[in-house]
Every structure is written in structure tokens, then in C-alpha cells.
Amino acid sequence: MAAPEEFFTGVLHEDLWEICIGEKLGEGMSRHVYVWEPDPTLVVKIETQRHHWYNIEEFNTWNVIEHTKHARWFAPVVAIAGGGSMLLQRRTQPLRRDELPAKLPTFFTDTKSKNFGLLNGQVVCHDYGIHMLRERGMSSRMINADWWDLEEE
């Protein structure tokens, strides 16, 4: 599928892109993440693949856990576009290797270190489009964190 900026064609769309979409912070298999210029404490995640629905999954997950004790592990979702193609989320800061927790809640399965960051001094997951909350529930059980991407370094 096309890069997100290719969706923004025409004067209005180009102007919106210029005003709202800031520095590119990263990309994954189906989304690109940018600073949200109107409020740099937020990021905008733009879906680049059809039928993946990770933005919608994160939005729904946040709505389920927002008022639970488990919310402390998640970067809050602020808003989502009606079709789910764009999601606004609180911006986290990158973690140093020594800041990665040794244990995580059992429902986190995509334990790539770059899926986590710091928000107000707390380690949170900012990429939770894939998780095991439905299968494992909102358990307080902790497991050893397997930071699989660090083995490559």
C-alpha cells in the first residue's frame, strides 16, 4: 500500500498534512507514527495496510482498560478517526536498555523493546495492536520479559 503522505493529495489534504503531521518517529508493518504538530505530547498513527485494524484494536483496548489498575501499562489513546485510519496517542520517550523491566504482565506478547516507552516516568506499551488480553484476561500475573529484538544487537 502507499505511504501515508501519498493519501494526502490536493491542496486541502496537503495543507492538513503540513500543519498537523510532524517528524516521523517510526514505522511498523502496517502503520507509520508521526509527531502530532498541534500538540507534540501526542503522536498520530496512520494505518498503511488495509484490513489490519491495529488502530481500532488499540482504541478498543484502551477503552476496556482505561479505568483499571492495568492502565498504568498502556500509553493512553486520545482519539481515533471514524474509519480508524488515524489514531492519536500520548507520546512516550524511548527507553534505554537498562530501563526495560525484567517482568511484564502476561497479556503482553509482542515484547519488542521499541513497543515500549516512558510516560511520566512509567514504562508503558505504546504499540498494543497485538496482545493476549482476550485470551489471558486482565491478569495481574507477571512473566519474565523476553526482549527478543535485543538479541539481534
Q: What is the predicted function of each stretch?
A:
Residues F8, C20, K24-G26, L119, ...:
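Intrinsically disordered, low-complexity segments enriched in small/polar residues
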Residues I65-E153:
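Conserved kinase catalytic-core helix
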Residues M1-G22:
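Juxta-kinase regulatory segment immediately upstream of eukaryotic protein kinase catalytic domains
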Residues W17-L25, A75-P76, P105-T106:
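Short secondary-structure junctions
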Residues C20-H70, G82, M86-L87:
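ATP-binding glycine-rich loop module of kinase domains
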